[in-house]
Regions:
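Alpha/beta-hydrolase superfamily serine-hydrolase fold, recognizing
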Residues: 1-175
Length: 175
């Protein structure tokens, strides 16, 4: 919040964009929820990649990706869920903003990026659907056949395409 407040001293909020990847996607959503709670002006746009406003292991994709990729679901599944519940209520909208439609209805224009082999696919799609239903401008891009970390490899054409989509989205929405 302090960094955002510092940015607001030098920039109009409509000139600020926030981007987060993986856990940073959730942090981006949490930031928007927190800014609303603190009555701060919202940024002009946000982009959330491979993480969004819902718990990443909710839905079909977390379970199926664990099976396909021989992923130890216990790291993020039942034990992981219990661990996160010990830290915060998973239905707390400051932890997972998707549980509060009022917060979600006030999101700035949002870009959501994921892939078909991303364990957080369901969370990202659910966030996008919720935003659209609530009347928030939201774009969803899904890349075929790459995993959760595809954006980390700049050699992949999909990574370059996703990066271009992010730049284009911010160019469109930030003044």
């Amino acid at each position: 919040t302090e960094v955002y407040k510092a940015l607001l001293r030098d920039y109009e909020p409509e000139n600020i964009g926030i981007y987060g990847y993986s856990a940073g996607g959730l942090l981006t959503a949490q930031s928007i929820a927190w800014f609303q709670k603190e009555k701060l002006p919202l940024p002009g746009a946000v982009a959330m990649s491979c993480g969004a406003a819902h718990f990443w292991m909710d839905g079909f994709s977390g379970s199926i990706q664990a099976a396909i990729n021989d992923f130890d679901l216990s790291l993020f599944g039942v034990r992981g869920t219990e661990y996160f519940r010990s830290l915060a209520d998973l239905k707390n909208p400051l932890a997972f903003p998707g549980f509060d439609s009022t917060i979600m209805a006030n999101f700035p224009p949002s870009l959501l990026i994921t892939s078909t082999q991303d364990f957080s696919l369901s969370s990202v799609v659910r966030t996008h659907s919720q935003l659209v239903t609530l009347g928030v401008e939201a774009d969803l891009h899904v890349w075929e056949g790459v995993d959760h970390s595809f954006l980390c490899n700049a050699c992949l054409p999909e990574s370059r395409e996703a990066s271009a989509a992010i730049v284009s989205f911010f160019d469109k929405h930030l003044k």
